[in-house]
Every structure is written in structure tokens, then in C-alpha cells.
Amino acid sequence: MIQMQTTLDVADNTGARAVMCIKVLGGSKRRYAGIGDIIKVSVKDAAPRGRVKKGEIYNAVVVRTAKGVRRKDGSLIRFGGNAAVLLNAKLEPIGTRIFGPVTRELRTERFMKIVSLAPEVL
């Protein structure tokens, strides 16, 4: 469950280490984002020679949350922290590698690239 001011780890090789959610996209009164939702983020910590710089603003898709995701069979998949993958204006991943597991809920037409790059799909 991600809301404004939530800090997230970055699960790709763009050079960003930490980002902060500045807006949950998808409606004017929308408060929370879960796995598979698109948010607007600001880069708070970045590697020196990465693709992105501190202070830049990007779209991102949430790939892991500490709150987890409930499946139809009743099982719950939780993670140790919150993580996102940075996207460009066309909602394509900026990075070429994804670190850590992602969930099967990302297997929509929009995010198949992220699922194919991920080392593990839960």
C-alpha cells in the first residue's frame, strides 16, 4: 500500500537507489497504490554515473509491497519492503535489468517486458 511521501527501493539498473511517491495516478481522489499500479516518483538517491539524476521526476510501476497482494485462492504474498521500476513517458521500463522477484499480477499487456526481465515471478 503506497501513498504520497512513501519511499521505495528501485528494482532496476537505472542508477536510482531510492524514490519517493509524489502522486498516485488513476483518479483525483485516489489515495493508495498497490502492486501493478502506476505512481509518479521523485528520485531521492542515485548512483553517480546512472541514467537518472537526483531530483528528477518519473513514472514508476509498483512491483513489491510490504502489504502484499491477496490471490483468488486466499494466499497472501508479502515482501520485505516496497519497490518500484522506473518508466519513461510511454510507460516502458527505462532500465534493462530487473532485480528481485515480481508477482504474477504484473502479467498484463502493459508490463510483460518487466515480467520477462525479472529473475523470478511469484
From Swiss-Prot:
CDD domains: Ribosomal_uL14 (cd00337). Pfam families: Ribosomal_L14. The keyword Amino-acid biosynthesis does not apply. InterPro entries: Ribosomal_uL14, Ribosomal_uL14_bac-type, Ribosomal_uL14_CS, Ribosomal_uL14_sf. One of its GO terms (biological process) is translation. The keyword Ribosomal protein applies. Keywords: Ribonucleoprotein, Ribosomal protein, RNA-binding, rRNA-binding. GO terms for molecular function: large ribosomal subunit rRNA binding; structural constituent of ribosome. GO terms for cellular component: cytosolic large ribosomal subunit. HAMAP family: Ribosomal_uL14 (MF_01367). Binds to 23S rRNA. Forms part of two intersubunit bridges in the 70S ribosome. Belongs to the universal ribosomal protein uL14 family. Part of the 50S ribosomal subunit. Forms a cluster with proteins L3 and L19. In the 70S ribosome, L14 and L19 interact and together make contacts with the 16S rRNA in bridges B5 and B8. This is Large ribosomal subunit protein uL14. It comes from Bordetella pertussis (strain Tohama I / ATCC BAA-589 / NCTC 13251).
